[in-house]
């Protein structure tokens, strides 16, 4: 009886795997236009996992298809809209690697990467280094593309990142003072003294997401 039960379990498992395999073998040898339509349909259905898999199939079957360039940007934006910012940046990095021209295409993709990082800070528990890296990336972007059409948006992001870091430094200094770590507190107090925001009339946020770092 036990052997029969095990046999049924194995058969059921094989049937499950067969069903899964059959599901994905349905989509092979499609034209670039058909793959493109399938990825768009996946995105519309909210199934980004399927969209990712179908993109991989499309890219492997049609390496030189001009539709790949567009679909990479579409997937990046879809993941950003779904707050999957790491995946968004993955596709943007792939876009730059494949189609970067050190001109408008690269500039646009780099802008989207910065925007994805900026949008990710609407979530709590983001780390200080990621903010500092974002400031560095923005300053590098502005140096590389001084006449960029995205300058107003980029500069707004830069100011907000720097403000967030300033308030975060205030929180860290306060934390160190309250826990008796005077040397560390003085380091952050010195940073605050040297900040261009020091004498600014700033409205302190009531509930700052970066407080979650210490909770």
Predicted regions and their residues:
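Short solvent-exposed coil/turn linkers within tandem alpha-helical repeat scaffolds
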Residues: 61-67, 97-106, 125, 139-156, ...
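Sec-dependent bacterial lipoprotein signal peptides
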Residues: 1-20
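Bacterial Sec signal peptide processing site at the extreme N-terminus
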Residues: 14-38, 50-52
């Amino acid at each position: 009886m036990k052997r029969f039960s095990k046999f049924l379990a194995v058969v059921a498992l094989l049937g499950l795997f067969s069903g899964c395999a059959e599901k994905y073998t349905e989509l092979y040898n499609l034209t670039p236009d058909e793959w493109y339509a399938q990825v768009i349909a996946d995105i519309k259905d909210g199934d980004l996992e399927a969209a990712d898999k179908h993109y991989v199939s499309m890219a492997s079957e049609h390496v030189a298809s001009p539709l790949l360039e567009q679909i990479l940007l579409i997937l990046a934006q879809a993941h950003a809209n779904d707050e999957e910012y790491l995946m968004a940046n993955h596709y943007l990095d792939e876009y730059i690697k494949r189609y970067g021209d050190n001109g408008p295409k690269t500039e646009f993709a780099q802008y989207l990467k910065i925007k994805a990082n900026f949008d990710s800070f609407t979530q709590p528990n983001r780390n200080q280094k990621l903010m500092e890296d974002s400031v560095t990336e923005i300053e590098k972007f502005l140096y590389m593309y001084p006449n960029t059409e995205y300058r107003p948006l980029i500069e707004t992001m830069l100011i907000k990142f720097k403000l967030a870091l300033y308030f975060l430094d205030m929180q860290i200094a306060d934390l160190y003072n309250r826990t008796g770590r005077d040397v560390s507190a003085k380091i952050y107090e010195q940073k605050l003294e040297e900040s261009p925001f020091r004498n600014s009339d700033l409205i302190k946020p009531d509930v700052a997401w970066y407080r979650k770092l210490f909770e």
